């Protein structure tokens, strides 16, 4: 009679091994699930890449046909490459530099509108005055407006479950770094008269910690920008909390004066028909 194999594994051991494997797979799955849900911010917008490509195509064909030769496929890839397979709390401006180069756009002098806590009002104005531009009216801002995105160093996929919150998790996340860099570039390129729409219904109309106060105002160049015209807008029927004579606006005036940029301010209830003073 032939010898039985010495390495035969008993059925009991096989069951134990199978059970152990299932437990290991379950643990890995749970750890991956916890990893994807570890951030406090909203996850990547569904169909992010398709939205970027679609918005780019719409902008270059319909909104600004002068940019029709822009390669939207390359832009989409550069956008994804900026954050895919990277630590979402360690994103740098260098990551976005290829995207910025592909989306270079010249804004005519005296057509730049900045805003702080008045996004909807600013966009209402540019929807009527199509020759004026907020950041979201440029190709770069138009594509990313209202979207969320992030990846992770351990995968080539986007994280649709959670992304870092700029305050609760980390400031150097994909979205925050993008908008800071885009805002810097937008202000840096401005020339002529620059307009800013501020919320006069808030107690702190000019907030030095806002994107306008911490990024845009300090990147306006006096050799190109002759004046900053501020519109302090109050809600219709509301009680004005700030006007052109308060300490908040005086601080803004002081900053522009130090930068040798002329400053004018006007307050109004609701949006004016024209921002020109």
Please name every model-derived segment.
Residues 1-22:
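Helix-loop boundary elements of multi-pass alpha-helical membrane proteins
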Residues 13-16, 20, 28-29, 34-36:
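Seven-transmembrane-like multi-pass membrane architecture, highlighting hydrophobic TM helices
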Residues 49-276:
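Catalytic toxin/effector domains delivered as secreted proteins or via bacterial secretion systems
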Residues 29-53:
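Ser/Thr/Pro/Gly-rich low-complexity linker/stalk segments immediately outside membranes or between
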């Amino acid at each position: 009679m032939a010898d039985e194999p010495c390495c035969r594994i008993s059925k009991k051991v096989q069951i134990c091994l199978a059970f152990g494997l299932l437990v290991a797979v379950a643990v890995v799955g749970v750890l991956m699930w916890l990893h994807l849900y570890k951030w406090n911010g909203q996850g990547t917008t569904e169909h992010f890449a398709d939205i970027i490509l679609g918005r780019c195509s719409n902008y270059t064909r319909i909104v600004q046909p002068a940019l029709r030769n822009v390669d939207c496929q390359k832009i989409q890839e550069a956008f994804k490459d900026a954050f895919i397979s990277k630590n979402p709390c360690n994103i740098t401006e260098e990551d976005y530099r290829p995207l910025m180069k592909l989306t270079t756009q010249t804004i005519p002098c005296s057509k730049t509108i900045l805003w702080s806590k008045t996004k909807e009002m600013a966009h209402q104005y540019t929807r009527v005055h199509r020759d004026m531009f907020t950041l979201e009216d440029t190709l770069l801002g138009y594509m990313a407006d209202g979207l969320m995105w992030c990846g992770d160093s351990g995968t080539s996929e986007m994280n649709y479950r959670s992304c870092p919150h700029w305050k609760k998790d980390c400031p150097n996340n994909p979205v925050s770094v993008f908008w800071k860099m885009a805002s810097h570039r937008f202000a840096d390129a401005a020339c002529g008269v620059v307009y800013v729409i501020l919320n006069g219904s808030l107690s702190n109309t000019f907030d030095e910690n806002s994107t306008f106060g911490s990024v845009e105002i300090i990147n306006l160049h006096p050799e190109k920008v002759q004046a900053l015209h501020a519109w302090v807008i109050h809600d219709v029927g509301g009680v004005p909390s700030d006007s052109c004579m308060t300490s908040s606006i005086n601080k803004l005036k002081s900053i522009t004066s130090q930068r040798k940029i002329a400053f004018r301010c006007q307050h109004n209830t609701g949006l004016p028909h024209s921002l020109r003073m």
